[in-house]
Protein backbone atom coordinates (compact mmCIF):
# COMPACT_ATOMS: atom_id res chain seq x y z
CA UNK A 1 0.00 0.00 0.00
CA UNK A 2 1.28 3.45 -0.93
CA UNK A 3 0.43 6.19 1.56
CA UNK A 4 0.89 9.95 1.58
CA UNK A 5 1.16 10.72 5.29
CA UNK A 6 0.18 14.31 6.07
CA UNK A 7 1.06 16.01 9.33
CA UNK A 8 -1.97 17.89 10.63
CA UNK A 9 0.19 19.77 13.13
CA UNK A 10 2.66 20.93 10.47
CA UNK A 11 -0.14 21.98 8.12
CA UNK A 12 -1.88 24.05 10.76
CA UNK A 13 1.39 25.52 11.97
CA UNK A 14 2.26 26.61 8.43
CA UNK A 15 -1.04 28.44 8.11
CA UNK A 16 -0.64 30.10 11.51
CA UNK A 17 2.81 31.36 10.48
CA UNK A 18 1.41 32.75 7.23
CA UNK A 19 -1.47 34.44 9.04
CA UNK A 20 0.95 36.11 11.42
CA UNK A 21 3.05 37.27 8.49
CA UNK A 22 0.19 38.80 6.46
CA UNK A 23 -1.27 40.75 9.38
CA UNK A 24 -4.87 41.87 8.92
CA UNK A 25 -5.24 40.55 5.38
CA UNK A 26 -7.68 37.69 4.84
CA UNK A 27 -6.35 34.30 3.77
CA UNK A 28 -7.73 32.48 0.75
CA UNK A 29 -6.31 28.95 0.81
CA UNK A 30 -5.96 27.36 -2.67
CA UNK A 31 -6.91 23.69 -2.62
CA UNK A 32 -7.14 23.15 -6.38
CA UNK A 33 -5.69 20.05 -8.04
CA UNK A 34 -6.79 17.90 -5.11
CA UNK A 35 -5.12 20.31 -2.68
CA UNK A 36 -1.89 20.16 -4.67
CA UNK A 37 -2.06 16.39 -4.46
CA UNK A 38 -2.64 16.22 -0.71
CA UNK A 39 -6.41 15.50 -0.83
CA UNK A 40 -9.07 18.22 -0.85
CA UNK A 41 -11.41 16.81 1.78
CA UNK A 42 -8.72 16.06 4.37
CA UNK A 43 -6.98 19.40 3.91
CA UNK A 44 -10.20 21.43 4.06
CA UNK A 45 -11.54 19.54 7.06
CA UNK A 46 -8.35 20.23 9.01
CA UNK A 47 -7.91 23.92 8.11
CA UNK A 48 -11.37 25.45 7.66
CA UNK A 49 -11.24 27.11 11.08
CA UNK A 50 -7.96 28.88 10.23
CA UNK A 51 -8.73 30.41 6.83
CA UNK A 52 -11.30 32.85 5.44
CA UNK A 53 -11.77 31.47 1.92
CA UNK A 54 -10.87 28.41 -0.09
CA UNK A 55 -10.03 28.62 -3.79
CA UNK A 56 -10.30 25.97 -6.49
CA UNK A 57 -9.96 25.68 -10.25
CA UNK A 58 -13.39 24.38 -11.22
CA UNK A 59 -16.94 23.61 -10.13
CA UNK A 60 -16.40 19.96 -9.21
CA UNK A 61 -13.56 20.89 -6.87
CA UNK A 62 -15.78 23.55 -5.30
CA UNK A 63 -18.48 20.99 -4.53
CA UNK A 64 -15.90 18.81 -2.77
CA UNK A 65 -15.05 21.77 -0.53
CA UNK A 66 -18.64 22.72 0.28
CA UNK A 67 -19.36 19.11 1.22
CA UNK A 68 -17.04 19.41 4.24
CA UNK A 69 -16.83 23.14 5.11
CA UNK A 70 -18.96 26.28 5.14
CA UNK A 71 -16.22 28.75 4.18
CA UNK A 72 -16.72 30.82 1.03
CA UNK A 73 -15.22 29.09 -2.02
CA UNK A 74 -13.85 30.99 -5.01
CA UNK A 75 -13.61 29.26 -8.39
CA UNK A 76 -10.73 30.68 -10.43
CA UNK A 77 -11.65 29.04 -13.73
CA UNK A 78 -14.35 29.35 -16.33
CA UNK A 79 -17.75 28.16 -15.08
CA UNK A 80 -19.58 25.51 -17.08
CA UNK A 81 -23.29 26.17 -17.35
CA UNK A 82 -24.37 22.67 -16.37
CA UNK A 83 -23.05 23.40 -12.86
CA UNK A 84 -23.93 27.07 -12.46
CA UNK A 85 -27.31 26.55 -10.77
CA UNK A 86 -25.82 24.33 -8.08
CA UNK A 87 -22.95 26.78 -7.61
CA UNK A 88 -25.31 29.70 -7.10
CA UNK A 89 -27.50 27.70 -4.72
CA UNK A 90 -24.42 26.88 -2.59
CA UNK A 91 -23.12 30.49 -2.68
CA UNK A 92 -19.93 29.43 -4.45
CA UNK A 93 -18.05 32.49 -5.69
CA UNK A 94 -17.88 32.84 -9.47
CA UNK A 95 -14.98 34.45 -11.35
CA UNK A 96 -16.01 36.94 -14.03
CA UNK A 97 -13.54 36.69 -16.90
CA UNK A 98 -15.10 39.17 -19.35
CA UNK A 99 -17.71 41.92 -19.54
CA UNK A 100 -20.23 39.86 -21.50
CA UNK A 101 -20.35 37.16 -18.84
CA UNK A 102 -22.13 39.51 -16.44
CA UNK A 103 -25.34 39.48 -18.45
CA UNK A 104 -25.32 35.68 -18.66
CA UNK A 105 -24.94 35.44 -14.89
CA UNK A 106 -27.75 37.91 -14.36
CA UNK A 107 -30.12 35.88 -16.53
CA UNK A 108 -29.45 32.70 -14.56
CA UNK A 109 -29.71 34.54 -11.23
CA UNK A 110 -33.11 35.96 -12.22
CA UNK A 111 -34.38 32.51 -13.13
CA UNK A 112 -33.25 31.18 -9.75
CA UNK A 113 -34.30 34.34 -7.92
CA UNK A 114 -30.97 34.29 -6.10
CA UNK A 115 -28.06 36.70 -6.24
CA UNK A 116 -24.62 35.55 -7.37
CA UNK A 117 -21.43 36.20 -5.41
CA UNK A 118 -18.72 37.23 -7.88
CA UNK A 119 -15.05 38.15 -8.04
CA UNK A 120 -13.74 39.88 -11.17
CA UNK A 121 -10.44 38.59 -12.53
CA UNK A 122 -8.42 41.38 -14.17
CA UNK A 123 -5.65 40.61 -16.66
CA UNK A 124 -2.85 42.94 -15.54
CA UNK A 125 -0.12 41.20 -17.51
CA UNK A 126 -0.21 37.42 -17.27
CA UNK A 127 -2.30 37.28 -20.46
CA UNK A 128 -4.04 34.05 -19.66
CA UNK A 129 -7.48 34.70 -18.20
CA UNK A 130 -9.39 37.73 -16.99
CA UNK A 131 -10.96 40.99 -18.11
CA UNK A 132 -8.64 43.10 -20.22
CA UNK A 133 -6.98 45.77 -18.09
CA UNK A 134 -8.32 48.54 -20.32
CA UNK A 135 -11.86 47.25 -19.81
CA UNK A 136 -11.52 46.66 -16.07
CA UNK A 137 -13.19 49.76 -14.65
CA UNK A 138 -16.20 49.46 -16.95
CA UNK A 139 -16.64 45.81 -15.98
CA UNK A 140 -16.26 46.50 -12.26
CA UNK A 141 -18.80 49.34 -12.44
CA UNK A 142 -21.28 47.17 -14.35
CA UNK A 143 -21.02 44.31 -11.87
CA UNK A 144 -21.22 46.62 -8.87
CA UNK A 145 -24.44 48.21 -10.15
CA UNK A 146 -26.10 44.90 -11.01
CA UNK A 147 -29.23 43.98 -9.08
CA UNK A 148 -28.32 40.29 -9.33
CA UNK A 149 -24.62 40.24 -8.53
CA UNK A 150 -22.86 40.74 -5.22
CA UNK A 151 -19.45 42.05 -6.21
CA UNK A 152 -17.42 40.56 -3.39
CA UNK A 153 -13.93 40.79 -4.87
CA UNK A 154 -11.58 41.99 -7.59
CA UNK A 155 -8.33 40.16 -8.24
CA UNK A 156 -5.42 39.52 -10.57
CA UNK A 157 -2.49 37.12 -10.77
CA UNK A 158 1.25 37.78 -10.96
CA UNK A 159 3.08 36.27 -13.92
CA UNK A 160 6.64 36.47 -12.58
CA UNK A 161 6.29 36.29 -8.80
CA UNK A 162 8.94 33.55 -8.61
CA UNK A 163 11.47 36.15 -9.81
CA UNK A 164 11.07 38.98 -7.34
CA UNK A 165 13.28 41.36 -9.37
CA UNK A 166 11.36 40.94 -12.62
CA UNK A 167 10.07 44.33 -13.88
CA UNK A 168 6.69 42.81 -14.74
CA UNK A 169 5.95 42.55 -11.01
CA UNK A 170 6.08 46.33 -10.63
CA UNK A 171 4.09 46.86 -13.82
CA UNK A 172 1.34 44.53 -12.64
CA UNK A 173 1.31 46.01 -9.14
CA UNK A 174 0.97 49.54 -10.53
CA UNK A 175 -1.89 48.47 -12.75
CA UNK A 176 -3.60 46.69 -9.90
CA UNK A 177 -3.14 49.73 -7.65
CA UNK A 178 -5.13 51.80 -10.12
CA UNK A 179 -7.84 49.12 -10.17
CA UNK A 180 -7.93 49.08 -6.36
CA UNK A 181 -8.30 52.87 -6.24
CA UNK A 182 -11.27 52.74 -8.61
CA UNK A 183 -12.84 49.77 -6.81
CA UNK A 184 -12.53 51.27 -3.34
CA UNK A 185 -14.17 54.41 -4.69
CA UNK A 186 -17.26 52.29 -5.24
CA UNK A 187 -17.10 50.38 -1.96
CA UNK A 188 -14.49 49.81 0.72
CA UNK A 189 -16.00 46.37 1.32
CA UNK A 190 -14.91 44.87 -2.01
CA UNK A 191 -12.01 42.48 -1.38
CA UNK A 192 -8.96 43.22 -3.55
CA UNK A 193 -6.38 40.45 -3.89
CA UNK A 194 -3.29 39.89 -6.03
CA UNK A 195 -0.69 37.83 -4.17
CA UNK A 196 0.13 34.17 -4.33
CA UNK A 197 2.86 32.66 -2.11
CA UNK A 198 5.81 34.08 -4.00
CA UNK A 199 4.04 37.39 -4.51
CA UNK A 200 3.60 38.52 -0.93
CA UNK A 201 6.99 37.11 0.10
CA UNK A 202 8.88 38.80 -2.71
CA UNK A 203 7.12 42.16 -3.01
CA UNK A 204 6.33 44.84 -0.46
CA UNK A 205 2.88 46.36 -0.06
CA UNK A 206 1.19 43.65 -2.03
CA UNK A 207 -1.06 41.87 0.48
CA UNK A 208 -4.04 44.23 -0.09
CA UNK A 209 -7.20 42.78 1.50
CA UNK A 210 -6.44 39.10 0.97
CA UNK A 211 -3.61 36.77 -0.07
CA UNK A 212 -3.70 33.36 -1.75
CA UNK A 213 -0.77 31.32 -0.37
CA UNK A 214 -0.99 27.94 -2.06
CA UNK A 215 2.34 26.14 -2.31
CA UNK A 216 3.65 27.89 0.82
CA UNK A 217 0.83 26.45 2.94
CA UNK A 218 1.87 22.95 1.93
CA UNK A 219 5.41 23.69 3.09
CA UNK A 220 7.38 24.64 0.00
CA UNK A 221 9.44 27.84 0.14
CA UNK A 222 10.92 29.96 -2.63
CA UNK A 223 14.71 29.64 -2.66
CA UNK A 224 15.14 33.40 -2.48
CA UNK A 225 13.42 33.81 0.86
CA UNK A 226 15.37 33.61 4.11
CA UNK A 227 13.10 35.33 6.65
CA UNK A 228 13.51 33.56 9.99
CA UNK A 229 9.77 33.27 10.71
CA UNK A 230 8.84 32.00 7.26
CA UNK A 231 11.72 29.51 7.41
CA UNK A 232 9.75 27.72 10.14
CA UNK A 233 7.34 26.55 7.45
CA UNK A 234 7.85 22.86 6.64
CA UNK A 235 6.57 20.35 4.04
CA UNK A 236 3.52 18.60 5.41
CA UNK A 237 3.71 15.21 3.67
CA UNK A 238 5.82 12.07 3.20
CA UNK A 239 5.17 9.44 0.54
CA UNK A 240 5.68 5.91 1.84
CA UNK A 241 5.54 2.40 0.44
CA UNK A 242 6.83 -1.08 1.32
CA UNK A 243 9.41 -3.49 -0.05
CA UNK A 244 7.40 -6.34 -1.61
CA UNK A 245 10.19 -8.50 -3.02
CA UNK A 246 13.97 -8.91 -2.89
CA UNK A 247 15.67 -10.13 -6.08
CA UNK A 248 19.23 -11.41 -6.42
CA UNK A 249 20.79 -10.93 -9.85
CA UNK A 250 22.78 -13.61 -11.58
CA UNK A 251 25.78 -12.86 -13.76
CA UNK A 252 24.85 -10.84 -16.86
CA UNK A 253 21.27 -10.16 -15.77
CA UNK A 254 19.45 -6.82 -15.79
CA UNK A 255 16.15 -5.49 -14.48
CA UNK A 256 13.09 -3.72 -15.85
CA UNK A 257 11.91 -2.84 -19.34
CA UNK A 258 14.67 -3.05 -21.98
CA UNK A 259 17.00 -4.24 -19.21
CA UNK A 260 18.83 -0.91 -19.31
CA UNK A 261 20.19 -1.53 -15.82
CA UNK A 262 22.81 -4.27 -15.72
CA UNK A 263 23.90 -5.24 -12.26
CA UNK A 264 26.64 -7.47 -10.88
CA UNK A 265 26.40 -11.07 -9.82
CA UNK A 266 24.92 -11.30 -6.36
CA UNK A 267 23.50 -7.76 -6.40
CA UNK A 268 20.20 -7.49 -4.57
CA UNK A 269 17.29 -5.36 -5.74
CA UNK A 270 14.20 -4.30 -3.81
CA UNK A 271 10.89 -4.10 -5.65
CA UNK A 272 8.61 -1.21 -4.62
CA UNK A 273 4.93 -1.27 -5.75
CA UNK A 274 4.66 2.30 -7.02
CA UNK A 275 5.12 3.66 -10.52
CA UNK A 276 4.08 6.32 -12.97
CA UNK A 277 0.55 4.90 -12.89
CA UNK A 278 0.36 6.34 -9.38
CA UNK A 279 1.57 9.73 -10.57
CA UNK A 280 5.14 9.18 -9.39
CA UNK A 281 7.54 10.76 -11.92
CA UNK A 282 8.73 8.24 -14.53
CA UNK A 283 11.80 10.41 -15.17
CA UNK A 284 13.20 9.29 -11.81
CA UNK A 285 13.71 5.75 -13.02
CA UNK A 286 17.40 4.80 -12.95
CA UNK A 287 18.40 8.08 -11.25
CA UNK A 288 16.18 8.75 -8.24
CA UNK A 289 16.72 7.76 -4.60
CA UNK A 290 14.59 6.24 -1.86
CA UNK A 291 15.14 5.95 1.88
CA UNK A 292 14.91 2.53 3.49
CA UNK A 293 15.76 2.28 7.20
CA UNK A 294 17.57 5.64 7.08
CA UNK A 295 19.82 4.60 4.19
CA UNK A 296 19.53 6.13 0.71
CA UNK A 297 19.35 3.64 -2.17
CA UNK A 298 19.44 4.44 -5.91
CA UNK A 299 16.67 3.44 -8.27
CA UNK A 300 17.74 0.84 -10.81
CA UNK A 301 16.24 0.42 -14.26
CA UNK A 302 13.21 1.96 -15.87
CA UNK A 303 10.19 2.71 -13.75
CA UNK A 304 7.09 0.82 -14.85
CA UNK A 305 3.44 1.75 -14.46
CA UNK A 306 3.05 -0.15 -11.22
CA UNK A 307 6.50 -0.57 -9.78
CA UNK A 308 10.15 0.39 -9.52
CA UNK A 309 13.32 -1.29 -8.32
CA UNK A 310 16.18 -0.01 -6.20
CA UNK A 311 19.68 -1.38 -5.88
CA UNK A 312 20.61 -2.63 -2.42
CA UNK A 313 24.12 -3.58 -3.53
CA UNK A 314 25.11 -6.56 -1.44
CA UNK A 315 22.35 -5.61 1.04
CA UNK A 316 24.77 -5.06 3.89
CA UNK A 317 22.01 -3.40 5.96
CA UNK A 318 19.70 -6.41 5.59
CA UNK A 319 16.69 -4.78 3.91
CA UNK A 320 13.73 -7.17 4.11
CA UNK A 321 10.30 -7.61 2.54
CA UNK A 322 7.87 -5.43 4.48
CA UNK A 323 10.37 -2.68 5.30
CA UNK A 324 9.05 0.86 4.90
CA UNK A 325 10.28 2.86 1.90
CA UNK A 326 10.24 6.66 1.94
CA UNK A 327 9.83 7.91 -1.63
CA UNK A 328 9.23 11.60 -0.85
CA UNK A 329 10.77 13.08 2.28
CA UNK A 330 9.43 16.02 4.29
CA UNK A 331 13.00 17.24 4.89
CA UNK A 332 13.86 19.64 2.03
CA UNK A 333 17.62 18.95 2.03
CA UNK A 334 17.17 15.19 1.57
CA UNK A 335 17.89 13.69 -1.83
CA UNK A 336 14.34 12.34 -2.03
CA UNK A 337 12.45 15.51 -1.00
CA UNK A 338 9.96 17.00 -3.46
CA UNK A 339 12.34 19.95 -3.82
CA UNK A 340 15.31 17.70 -4.67
CA UNK A 341 13.26 15.51 -7.00
CA UNK A 342 11.97 18.57 -8.85
CA UNK A 343 15.50 19.89 -9.31
CA UNK A 344 16.70 16.53 -10.55
CA UNK A 345 14.10 16.21 -13.31
CA UNK A 346 13.86 19.93 -14.13
CA UNK A 347 10.38 20.66 -12.86
CA UNK A 348 8.75 22.23 -9.78
CA UNK A 349 7.38 20.91 -6.49
CA UNK A 350 3.81 21.68 -7.64
CA UNK A 351 4.28 19.13 -10.43
CA UNK A 352 5.73 16.45 -8.16
CA UNK A 353 2.93 16.66 -5.60
CA UNK A 354 -0.15 17.49 -7.68
CA UNK A 355 0.28 14.54 -10.05
CA UNK A 356 0.10 11.96 -7.24
CA UNK A 357 -3.24 10.31 -7.95
CA UNK A 358 -5.95 8.44 -6.09
CA UNK A 359 -4.15 5.09 -6.20
CA UNK A 360 -2.18 6.58 -3.31
CA UNK A 361 -3.95 6.66 0.06
CA UNK A 362 -3.93 9.98 1.94
CA UNK A 363 -3.68 9.74 5.70
CA UNK A 364 -3.77 12.63 8.18
CA UNK A 365 -1.61 11.96 11.23
Curated annotation (Swiss-Prot):
The lineage of its organism: Bacteria, Pseudomonadati, Pseudomonadota, Gammaproteobacteria, Thiotrichales. SUPFAM superfamilies: Alanine racemase C-terminal domain-like (SSF50621), PLP-binding barrel (SSF51419). It is an enzyme of class 5 (isomerase). InterPro entries: Ala_racemase, Ala_racemase/Decarboxylase_C, Ala_racemase_C, Ala_racemase_N, PLP-binding_barrel. Pathway: Amino-acid biosynthesis; D-alanine biosynthesis; D-alanine from L-alanine: step 1/1. Catalyzes the interconversion of L-alanine and D-alanine. May also act on other amino acids. GO terms for biological process: D-alanine biosynthetic process. Belongs to the alanine racemase family. It catalyses: L-alanine = D-alanine. Keywords: Isomerase, Pyridoxal phosphate. It comes from the Bacteria. Pfam families: Ala_racemase_C (PF00842), Ala_racemase_N (PF01168). One of its GO terms (molecular function) is alanine racemase activity. This is Alanine racemase. The gene is alr.
